[in-house]
Amino acid sequence: MKKLYWIILIAVVLACSGILMSLHLSVTKEEMTYPSFLDAVNQNQVASVQFKENDSTLKVILNSDKDTTYIVPNPKTENFTEFLLLRNIKVDNSDSYSATKVIQIILIITVGTGVFLFIRTSGGKDKPLMKDAAKNKKAENRVKLGDVAGNAEAKSMVGDIIDFIKEPEKYSALGARMPKGVMLYGPPGTGKTLIAKAIATEAGVPFYAMSGSDFVQMYVGVGASRIRTLFNKAKKSEKAVIFIDEIDAIGKKRARSTSASNDERDQTLNALLTEMSGFHENKGIVVIGATNRLDTLDEALLRPGRFDRQIEVGLPDILARKKILKLYGDKKPLGDDVDLEVLAKNTVSFSGAMLENLLNEAAIQAANEKSSYIQSSHVDKAFYTVIAGSPLQDRSFISEKDKSITAYHEAGHALATKLLQPEQYISKVTIIPSVKGAGGFNLSIPKDSLYQSKRQILCSIQILLAGRVAEELIFGEEEITTGASNDIQKASAMLVDYLNKYGMDDEMGLFSTVVLEDQYDTDFLNKCRNQMHALYDTTKKLMTENKKLLIEITNELLEKESLKGEDIDRICLKEAV
């Protein structure tokens, strides 16, 4: 409110100054010679004269035209004021500021105040920073490791950190020192922040949490100052957990550029490194960083003595997903038809945050339908809302031809999945467009696996190409559409990795072009193109042999708009019989 008050006040002052300036500038000024001035005096035409002793000009106003100011050279003679007064002319030679100078002073004060307030509000909020940290210390220390479902390995690796904070003597007796820093890395939404909070809670120490972006400002030196202030606050607690989320905002590899933004980031990073190096006297303080991109961090940040321990917090497997769903599901009224085990199976590649969002969306669906329980239908709607966005309500603009193209395209993906990777579970095939712009989508659930085989990669590329193949097979080569653009992009990325990263190609052998810093030559690009054409032709042959199945799936898809994996199985089984 105080900031808004100052903004309004400055705006009003500027507006008033502008009005005064415009009024002042609206006064007409004309030059007059001194002889003409004397003639006007002798004819009693002069109303007033304004001047100061050292002024080079006089400002004269006539009785006949008081809206015009005449500028007359100042003769600077003795008794000039008496000469005018004896002729009943008003004389103003007071040492007062002109309107122009008054306006200039007002503008200078206003602009100066505005600059001061801007610097104060955006440059150095160390006190509010510490106020937030103190608030986190009281309010956030509620999460325990038991509240973090899944990530058993990560929780196990932070266990000794907690024990070290609580009983440092047990370790120091054996000459062990506590890791100065712990780096939690992994995809977004996997529970890195929760684990950091749990460490502080389990150890019973204050928790100071800030985001890396809070330290980076446009003014060089502000970020470094905030780092020092935060660490000084933590040191007063003797034992504490300092958590810096999105640490890559300040910890990226230092560039050679000398721009101001790089100077600020480098100074902030140097301040962080210095503070961590001086922790030998503060054995109860541990710094925890979190990032989605470990590979972008500066080597100096990850060396021993800084962030000694690096812990991956990955996506949950099926058992962890089941635990996470149960954790959040216990807080909601789930119906008897909601099977969390099946849901865990269908949510491959979901993070913990996505699983929480899934059940939250299901609860919203149930509330919208005024249901007392979250039913399986609500979970299904929420699942596809999270994956592809809400269904488009108004579909009147979609022509029958576009609908048919979408149906054949999605049926092509589904059929190729069934033929090439039958181990994958087809969850849903739909031609209902979403608000995210998708005309339809095909959702297949792969099995949890650490690796992909050569066959799986090539089959995945063929499945991506199958949508375009189906379009060409049914509508002709000249009628293929832009609907496969995203499929082609994904297939190209997979093929490049297949050829230059995984060493699976017979001709290229065990050589990766990644070491060449992505400087691909023409031969490599031609090889990618030829390999893609070969996979396309193989897919086209497969779809031609099963064209009848493609048409059957498409017809039912056009009729029902959405099909499940069981429907695809039934159609394939019927055709086989």
Swiss-Prot record:
Binds 1 zinc ion per subunit. The keyword Zinc applies. Its EC number is 3.4.24.-. Keywords: ATP-binding, Cell membrane, Hydrolase, Membrane, Metal-binding, Metalloprotease, Nucleotide-binding, Protease, Transmembrane, Transmembrane helix, Zinc. CDD domains: RecA-like_FtsH. SUPFAM superfamilies: FtsH protease domain-like, P-loop containing nucleoside triphosphate hydrolases. Pfam families: AAA (PF00004), AAA_lid_3 (PF17862), FtsH_ext (PF06480), Peptidase_M41 (PF01434). Signal peptide: none annotated. It is a multi-pass membrane protein. It is an enzyme of class 3 (hydrolase). The chain crosses the membrane at residues 4-24, 99-119. ATP binds at residues 186-193. Zn(2+) binds at residues 409, 413, 487. The active site is at 410. Residues 25-98 are extracellular. GO terms for molecular function: ATP binding; ATP hydrolysis activity; ATP-dependent peptidase activity; metalloendopeptidase activity; zinc ion binding. Its cofactor is Zn(2+). Acts as a processive, ATP-dependent zinc metallopeptidase for both cytoplasmic and membrane proteins. Plays a role in the quality control of integral membrane proteins. This is ATP-dependent zinc metalloprotease FtsH. The gene is ftsH.
